[in-house]
């Protein structure tokens, strides 16, 4: 299994918060800011953790209003 890399565009104000949330789930993923002005991020998801990350993103969308749009780089 390999690390899954997915790119998203979120609201600029949510980058720091999402990064903090991802870091709190020790080792499931790394968030990298690709373009801070366009608010494009890359999630590097650890093998076997994809489902957890997708569930987390769905929960953040519902509970915190963090909207992410998949971006093709």
Question: Where are each of the predicted segments found?
Answer:
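N-terminal intrinsically disordered, cationic/polar leader segments
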Residues: 3-24, 28-73
